[in-house]
């Protein structure tokens, strides 16, 4: 989402959320991810009620930029749960209570096997495509991804492109595909089918994010992409301190 564009709307939602939580009077506030929203809620709530205990799951990416945020965060978050072990030193350094709990994608047990050939009865190699999990991301990336497929089709006729979606965005993705009249594309939204389709894929193209972990776990070569508007790009470029944009490359340091 374009945070800069929607800053006033977001601020209003934060205040509404803080009020609703305060009226509910919980003993513990448990926030998950989305630090631009959840941590602001926790901070404002803590000011109004210093006795409430706060726990946050999925640490903000202080290893990418603004490492100094930890000093501020520990003033209103009592305990933070970490996805990656390499994050721990950043919070230990500031004596902030934290715990490495792991990432669900890396810990999940294997599911029952599904024969992908029963789903796609076509003797062609699969390329998995992950266009994002928000409307704004899909709207930005689908035209780029479909142009990529059209270019590939000019030289290679042996691939089927599988768009991985949720039921919520299935129709949106399908509408983009139909608008370009590309026949060798499929869209799937069933999680078990998606998992095994990825494992059968020879390649993947994905929007930067958690999905890159799943792709890596499946040992599928990939291209990771992201596109932001020019104003956001200028701001982020001056603040980001890591060399890589993909969590896998950041973890590996190469």
Enumerate the language-model features and the residues they cover.
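Nucleotide-activated sugar donor-binding and catalytic core shared by glycosyltransferases
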Residues: 1-254
